[in-house]
């Protein structure tokens, strides 16, 4: 009887350990691809998404042109991000990957931000970048590296990270992300540009500054 109880407890413990892993894992694909359909008119419902009828899929559904061309840099931080994700390359649906091109002006940066659903791996195509990420609480450890052309750096999923052009000429980088739609939370505009605005007194206490400093920042980032 005691042996049976021990066996039951062992099995229960094993189930408790493996169940969270099972729940956290994405389901395996049941088809070669699932090109996202803009409407359900010519689609089939697979794995929670409307997918284009495979018989209507063409090579263009897996194609995105133009990453060889830089977009104008008009942002105050001096960078432009061109994203290729499931929103503009429908064939990425269910494939768990996306791509971005980042152009940096001289002294430009891709400011501190995080991707809530993806790990990022970045390669420098042109120029020199200072990159880094910060670990979670309580250590908040900073890892930084200077990257030159051809160098690669990885940013773990969910951690705050950044890139800054420290060269004397414009820079270009490409990055792959482990999600078809990784999302992005840029820290400064998210905190100070929230809509509706976060109470300045809350942010003043969090950042240990005068509320007038917070209100000035909120004015700058107001959408």
Swiss-Prot record:
Which pairs are disulfide-linked?
A: 34-51
What UniProt keywords apply to this chain's record, in alphabetical order? Apoplast, Disulfide bond, Glycoprotein, Manganese, Metal-binding, Secreted, Signal
- Localization per record: Secreted, Extracellular space, Apoplast
- Glycosylation (residues): 38
Residues that hold Mn(2+) according to the record: 113, 115, 120, 161
Q: Which positions carry the signal peptide feature in this UniProt record?
A: 1-24
Q: Does the keyword Magnesium apply?
A: no
Q: Name one GO molecular function term.
A: manganese ion binding
Please state the protein's primary subcellular location: secreted
Gene Ontology cellular-component terms listed: apoplast
Q: Name one Pfam family in it.
A: Cupin_1
- In which domain of life is the source organism classified? Eukaryota
What positions does the domain Cupin type-1 occupy? 65-215
Transmembrane segments in this chain: where? none
Q: What does this protein do?
A: May play a role in plant defense. Probably has no oxalate oxidase activity even if the active site is conserved.
Its family?
Answer: Belongs to the germin family.
How is the subunit organization of this protein annotated in UniProt?
Oligomer (believed to be a pentamer but probably hexamer).
Its recorded name reads Germin-like protein subfamily 1 member 10
